[in-house]
């Protein structure tokens, strides 16, 4: 191991970086396929372009050196961050330059957000609708305006500065990626130092990140939003640097500011309860969470993460060792427990990525549900289009990330799993019990599928025969979700009890309580549950379990199975076990991801359908003269969604009227997308239903015709491989299906307002 030259600071210890390890060459980097000896020769056949895409980021195929792979991944992270900063900059620039943000700030109930104006080239300006006060543009549903208001941005200069700042950050990140690969590249030991990594992530990123955001919320967001809520015009509100250190200005809004830091140092922290609160529920002015609750929440997280970050043994020889924690973690039925997993997670980035993807995918789904039950930003709750979009967006992200977790778990099993390291630990025992696990999971899927779908089939039969008294419904044979109702009641009444003694209210109105109206629209209310909810819940359970069955089977059988004992030698993706063995196709780890994605699509689609209809029926609506609510679909969920016919008639057909009739209106783009995405989806079936041989024969006859005309191409055309065909089919299937449903949702909710 080499040490860095010179300087007393490195004396006696090894350097953590290599200086100038890889020369930077635009000539090399600009050559397609430079990372692969075969690809770098250029295309001989059309297969080259497919292999180029498949292998460009598959660093394992480019080198066996774990340090080099680690450096490439680390460098790529900075490139990824750079792209994110450019994306953020673009959104904020649009808000500053092309939007009605300032009009929306002044009257968020009378204006719809728009940050996109379509140019009138051949009539596309029909897409620009009047979103309020005469501003014509495309209504956006990203939540951009709500988060900018929540952050306290009221001045064009702030938005332009943020947009430019994000571009500067993008350049810095891009340079950092270059610097940490070509100039000073970390050594493998640096990447494998789990304790220092945890300390840095917990204290610096999460702890100080939360603390910094708490500071912003208290010193910028709270005063600006309080002034906006009290009716002060945005242009009359001073920009942050004008009041940041003006305690008199702040004390007028939050009196405890007059006391400065004295309450903090005298442990009289309760004095700050005017801006660090525990109110619960939603602010009746904006329909969002109380900004003071949000500040309190982030302060608590900051304290927790900073304390947690001091847990691990780094420079001073005190604290926990990650390896020791794992090796001492044994249960009565887990053999050697987590022994060996430290080695797994420090030598296989696929294993670590699998855990992170599954975790963050689950977080994304949790975020989707929190965004409507506890809308964090001002006036988000009554912007139904944005509410819907944020739910659908985070559900799809969650689904894809979880499947990605299974993909990298299978890659880990094929490429990185070492049986010698995993002896009788939890991973080894999972593999030894895989037949039991899969057969039980299969039984659960069969049970859930027949019983949950059977309830719907029963109801369709009874309704078709004119026997409503024999249906499963709230008015006949009831299947009430009593446990869910119990949890709702428990949470609705939690404030002031021993479980939440300091809370002034429940965390969400979804648990119970009267509707909260903002501008005459329901921001949130009690989400009542009944037989229809019990039934669709079990459909969700069925689809989740089938998706998990496919993914878990792919992971547990990635290395071997009774059918193909030497599967590990065939790699992560292979079409079949050679030409001599029939019936071995679609058994690779890759194929399980391929199949799992279809079921993930089914699963998330029904979740989104459920959410969209349920909210229209039982939550979203306008206040009527009697103090009640006129719901968008008049509460038809409970009786219509309990039959398959009801789903087809009252949801898919009845609610697609807006997108089907959108031509000639500002929503016509959604009609075009709806039609085009159906075509893309149908086009996918051509790839999924036909085999490679058909296309190769067709190509050869076409090449023959070109040769006769002496216009044969230099690059030999070749049909896609079986795996490539499946990938292209899957991509079109998912793209077509998701865009079809997305355009349907948006056209309807924007038309209803």
UniProtKB/Swiss-Prot annotation:
Q: How does it assemble?
A: The PsaA/B heterodimer binds the P700 chlorophyll special pair and subsequent electron acceptors. PSI consists of a core antenna complex that captures photons, and an electron transfer chain that converts photonic excitation into a charge separation. The cyanobacterial PSI reaction center is composed of one copy each of PsaA,B,C,D,E,F,I,J,K,L,M and X, and forms trimeric complexes.
* Primary location group: membrane
Where chlorophyll a' binds, per the record, is at: 678
Q: Report the GO molecular function annotations.
A: 4 iron, 4 sulfur cluster binding; chlorophyll binding; electron transfer activity; magnesium ion binding; oxidoreductase activity
Q: Where does phylloquinone bind?
A: 695
Q: Name one Pfam family in it.
A: PsaA_PsaB
Compartments where located: Cellular thylakoid membrane
Q: What does this protein do?
A: PsaA and PsaB bind P700, the primary electron donor of photosystem I (PSI), as well as the electron acceptors A0, A1 and FX. PSI is a plastocyanin/cytochrome c6-ferredoxin oxidoreductase, converting photonic excitation into a charge separation, which transfers an electron from the donor P700 chlorophyll pair to the spectroscopically characterized acceptors A0, A1, FX, FA and FB in turn. Oxidized P700 is reduced on the lumenal side of the thylakoid membrane by plastocyanin or cytochrome c6.
Annotated keywords: 4Fe-4S, Chlorophyll, Chromophore, Electron transport, Iron, Iron-sulfur, Magnesium, Membrane, Metal-binding, Oxidoreductase, Photosynthesis, Photosystem I, Thylakoid, Transmembrane, Transmembrane helix, Transport
Q: Which InterPro entries match?
A: PSI_PsaA, PSI_PsaA/B, PSI_PsaA/B_CS, PSI_PsaA/B_sf
The family note in this entry says:
Belongs to the PsaA/PsaB family.
Q: Where does [4Fe-4S] cluster bind?
A: 576, 585
Q: What is this protein called?
A: Photosystem I P700 chlorophyll a apoprotein A1
Q: How is the cofactor bound?
A: PSI electron transfer chain: 5 chlorophyll a, 1 chlorophyll a', 2 phylloquinones and 3 4Fe-4S clusters. PSI core antenna: 90 chlorophyll a, 22 carotenoids, 3 phospholipids and 1 galactolipid. P700 is a chlorophyll a/chlorophyll a' dimer, A0 is one or more chlorophyll a, A1 is one or both phylloquinones and FX is a shared 4Fe-4S iron-sulfur center.
Gene3D superfamilies in the cross-refs: Photosystem I PsaA/PsaB
Which SUPFAM superfamilies does the UniProt record give?
Answer: Photosystem I subunits PsaA/PsaB
Bilayer topology reads:
Multi-pass membrane protein
Q: Which GO terms describe its cellular component?
A: photosystem I; plasma membrane-derived thylakoid membrane
* Enzyme Commission identifier(s): 1.97.1.12
Catalytic reaction equation(s): reduced [plastocyanin] + hnu + oxidized [2Fe-2S]-[ferredoxin] = oxidized [plastocyanin] + reduced [2Fe-2S]-[ferredoxin]
List the taxonomic lineage: Bacteria, Bacillati, Cyanobacteriota, Cyanophyceae, Acaryochloridales
| Transmembrane spans | 73-96, 159-182, 198-222, 294-312, 349-372, 388-414, 436-458, 534-552, 592-613, 667-689, 727-747
NCBIfam families assigned: psaA (TIGR01335)
| Gene Ontology annotations of biological process type | photosynthesis
């Amino acid at each position: 191991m080499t040490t860095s030259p010179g300087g007393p600071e490195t004396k006696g210890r090894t350097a953590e970086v290599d200086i100038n390890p890889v020369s930077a060459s635009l000539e090399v980097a600009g050559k397609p396929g430079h990372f692969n000896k075969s690809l770098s020769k250029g295309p001989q056949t059309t297969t080259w372009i497919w292999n180029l895409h498949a292998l460009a980021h598959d660093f394992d195929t480019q080198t066996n050196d774990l340090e080099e792979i680690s450096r490439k991944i680390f460098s790529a992270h900075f490139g990824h961050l750079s792209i994110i900063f450019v994306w953020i900059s673009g959104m904020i620039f649009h808000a500053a330059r092309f939007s009605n943000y300032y009009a929306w700030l002044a009257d968020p109930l009378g204006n719809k957000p728009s940050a996109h104006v379509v140019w009138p080239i051949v009539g596309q300006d029909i897409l620009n609708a009047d979103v309020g006060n005469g501003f014509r543009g495309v209504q956006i549903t990203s939540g951009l305006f709500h988060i900018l208001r929540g952050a306290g941005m009221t001045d064009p200069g702030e938005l332009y500065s943020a947009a430019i700042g994000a571009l500067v950050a993008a350049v810095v990140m891009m340079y950092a990626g270059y610097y940490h690969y070509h100039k000073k590249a970390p050594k493998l030991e640096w990447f494998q130092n789990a304790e220092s990594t945890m300390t840095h992530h917990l204290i610096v990123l999460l702890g100080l990140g939360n603390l910094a955001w708490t500071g912003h919320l208290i010193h910028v967001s709270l005063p600006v939003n309080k002034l906006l809520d009290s009716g002060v015009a945005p242009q009359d509100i001073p920009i942050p640097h004008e009041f940041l250190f003006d305690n008199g200005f702040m004390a007028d809004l939050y009196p405890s500011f007059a006391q400065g830091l004295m309450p903090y140092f005298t442990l009289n922290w309760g004095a700050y309860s005017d801006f660090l609160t525990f109110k619960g529920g939603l602010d009746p002015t904006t329909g969002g969470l109380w900004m003071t609750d949000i500040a309190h929440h982030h302060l608590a997280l900051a304290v927790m993460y900073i304390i947690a970050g001091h847990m691990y043994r780094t420079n001073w020889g005190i604290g926990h060792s990650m390896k020791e924690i794992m090796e001492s973690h044994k249960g009565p039925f887990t053999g050697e427990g987590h022994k060996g997993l430290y080695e797994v997670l420090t030598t296989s980035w696929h294993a670590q990525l699998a855990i992170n993807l599954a975790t963050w995918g689950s977080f994304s789904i949790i975020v989707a549900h929190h965004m409507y039950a506890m809308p964090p930003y001002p006036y988000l709750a009554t912007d139904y289009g944005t509410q819907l979009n944020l739910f659908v967006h985070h559900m799809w992200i969650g689904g894809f990330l979880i499947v990605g977790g299974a993909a990298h778990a299978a890659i880990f099993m094929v490429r990185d799993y070492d049986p010698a390291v995993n002896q009788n630990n939890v991973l080894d025992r999972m593999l030894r019990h895989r037949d039991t696990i899969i057969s039980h999971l299969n039984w659960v899927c069969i049970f859930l599928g027949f019983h949950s779908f059977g309830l719907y089939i029963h109801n369709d039969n009874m309704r078709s025969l004119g026997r409503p008294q024999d249906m499963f419904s709230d008015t006949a044979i009831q299947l009430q979700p009593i446990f869910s109702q119990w949890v709702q009641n428990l949470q609705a009444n939690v404030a002031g009890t021993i479980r939440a003694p300091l809370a002034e209210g429940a965390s969400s109105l979804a648990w119970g309580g009267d509707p909260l109206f903002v501008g005459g629209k329901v921001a949130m209310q009690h989400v009542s549950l009944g037989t229809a909810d019990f039934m669709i819940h079990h459909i969700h359970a069925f689809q989740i379990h089938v998706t998990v069955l496919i993914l878990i089977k792919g992971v547990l059988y990635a290395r071997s199975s009774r059918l193909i004992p030497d599967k590990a030698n065939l790699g992560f993706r292979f079409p079949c076990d050679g030409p001599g063995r029939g019936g071995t196709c679609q058994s690779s780890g890759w194929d399980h991801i391929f199949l799992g994605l279809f079921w993930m699509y089914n699963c998330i689609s029904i979740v989104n359908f459920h959410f969209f209809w349920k909210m229209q029926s039982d939550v979203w609506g306008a206040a009527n003269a009697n103090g009640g609510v006129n719901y968008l679909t008049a509460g038809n969920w409970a009786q219509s969604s309990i039959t398959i016919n009801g789903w087809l008639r009252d949801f898919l057909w009845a609610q697609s009227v807006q997108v089907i009739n959108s031509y000639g209106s500002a929503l016509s783009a959604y009609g075009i997308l709806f039609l085009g995405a159906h075509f893309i989806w149908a086009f996918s079936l051509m790839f999924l239903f036909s085999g490679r041989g058909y296309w190769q024969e067709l190509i050869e006859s076409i090449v023959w015709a070109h040769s006769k005309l002496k216009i044969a191409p230099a690059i030999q055309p070749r049909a896609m491989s079986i795996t490539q065909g499946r990938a292209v089919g899957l991509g079109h299937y998912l793209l077509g299906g998701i865009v079809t449903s997305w355009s349907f949702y948006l056209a309807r909710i924007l038309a209803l307002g």
